[in-house]
Amino acid sequence: MSTDNKQSLPAITLAAIGVVYGDIGTSPLYTLRECLSGQFGFGVERDAVFGFLSLIFWLLIFVVSIKYLTFVMRADNAGEGGILTLMSLAGRNTSARTTSMLVIMGLIGGSFFYGEVVITPAISVMSAIEGLEIVAPQLDTWIVPLSIIVLTLLFMIQKHGTAMVGKLFAPIMLTWFLILAGLGLRSIIANQEVLYALNPMWAVHFFLEYKTVSFIALGAVVLSITGGEALYADMGHFGKFPIRLAWFTVVLPSLTLNYFGQGALLLKNPEAIKNPFFLLAPDWALIPLLIIAALATVIASQAVISGVFSLTRQAVRLGYLSPMRIIHTSEMESGQIYIPFVNWMLYVAVVIVIVSFEHSSNLAAAYGIAVTGTMVLTSILSTTVARQNWHWNKYFVALILIAFLCVDIPLFTANLDKLLSGGWLPLSLGTVMFIVMTTWKSERFRLLRRMHEHGNSLEAMIASLEKSPPVRVPGTAVYMSRAINVIPFALMHNLKHNKVLHERVILLTLRTEDAPYVHNVRRVQIEQLSPTFWRVVASYGWRETPNVEEVFHRCGLEGLSCRMMETSFFMSHESLILGKRPWYLRLRGKLYLLLQRNALRAPDQFEIPPNRVIELGTQVEI
């Protein structure tokens, strides 16, 4: 969805509220409770309440309003955002060594997202279901089972797409934010003293009074800004202006009113700390509030799941993850996809997390390390873009980076205190994903280099075949080639073993460009290499899925007629064996072999009819 679509600005803004702000919009369920629950050594005291409220408000202003919405969202790739997009932009005009460092940062940021995404659905849904403790305390043993049931249903409907229920997201989330604002305003009116916390000096006073403990407490404050990265990642769906408009007109005021309303309640009734969010509501409204909270957390979880699907597709298309089955669930919206393997792996991980941690307060101890780590990396990558791509003054860029890091690094460092109490979980998951992505990329490069290191010139081979042709058989043969100027392995092995060649040979390369989409005019490039050889290069963006049938259709429009069911597709199938390596490289090689065995086969990946495919095997030592 973008402003290019003929939709009104209010409609797009409403849709952005429904998708983009689910995570950060459900943070009031648990943030202030975790800040003042006593784990940091101070109770519900006036100075502590004012200090936390001031920190939360000014973090929302600085991190979300200024850093992400004003600065980072300027860095877009054809309207698209996200940490991998930022990585790609930052590396465009830098040296090879610097680019390598930026790529590593981007991959770490993407890996951190995988680590946190296991926690987000669990903590969001559990914190909503925990409202049962207020409504009916005897039902507290049902919190874990009900959370699992809700999330099971959510993961089960993914294969059907979210187009139908997605239409309900926006009105539900708008209702949610209005409820946040209403509950908070009602409490603030009863105790207006809490508005003094808008003064940033209360945050300064908080650090001066509580010293080291206040620094550690930042690990709880950061819960208020989790989901900030989603604003940038979802930029391509809604556009910059609608996302900014939604934040400043609806989301920020609602969050501020609710946090300060909880603070006003706690100043009057410190015992409300057991669940200040639900205790804001009158008794008659608790059950309706519980229902709308559950719906809001499901929507927040859906946004995160969709984000995982999008990030995975981007990583696959950029060559950082092995090919896997990607199902389009909407004929109208290319961004709506379903990846079965990712969906069920994530589901299993979320259920294990819920059963292991049992309460959202325990999960809060695991939340934040990966989020703040990504914030640090985003600051570095975005300021690199400002310097290298926008050519801003280096001293001005340095000041911006210092300002960002003065907030990001303390938040990240404070969250390291959570390492042993649960923070190891997202870090471990992120580390696994980083190893997987770097292994696939590096070993794939090693394999391709090994396969072509002794190859002859493509032009020389074609000239030789035209001069002394082998037996030619009727029809068209398509040889899939990973690189433009190399001889496809399948072609060499077909000549070696079968000693025949089709009357017409097409060397097809499917290429992923550094852009989300490629215009149809630039989709296919055709070059005739000889009277019987053609080279076809089809370009796709990383948000698009290659389709050979579409390529053939466009070839026909440009004069190279091809009929899918009358064409033979020759592909190479590599049987890999490990050569002599140091032990650590041998481990990486074994991981690559495992990934390779489970990768989606090329015919399925490019939607080629199986009965038209001929695979020629070859053994390659890596």
Curated annotation (Swiss-Prot):
Q: Which reaction does it catalyse?
A: K(+)(in) + H(+)(in) = K(+)(out) + H(+)(out)
**Where's it found, cell-wise?**
Cell inner membrane
Show the GO MF annotations.
potassium ion transmembrane transporter activity; symporter activity
TM region positions: 9-29, 49-69, 103-123, 137-157, 165-185, 213-233, 247-267, 276-296, 337-357, 363-383, 396-416, 419-439
Top-level lineage group: Bacteria
Which InterPro entries would you find in this protein's record? K+_transporter (IPR003855), K_trans_C (IPR053952), K_trans_N (IPR053951), Kup (IPR023051)
Entry membrane topology: Multi-pass membrane protein
Show the HAMAP family listed in the entry. Kup
Function as written in the Swiss-Prot or TrEMBL entry: Responsible for the low-affinity transport of potassium into the cell. Likely operates as a K(+):H(+) symporter.
- Its protein name is Low affinity potassium transport system protein Kup
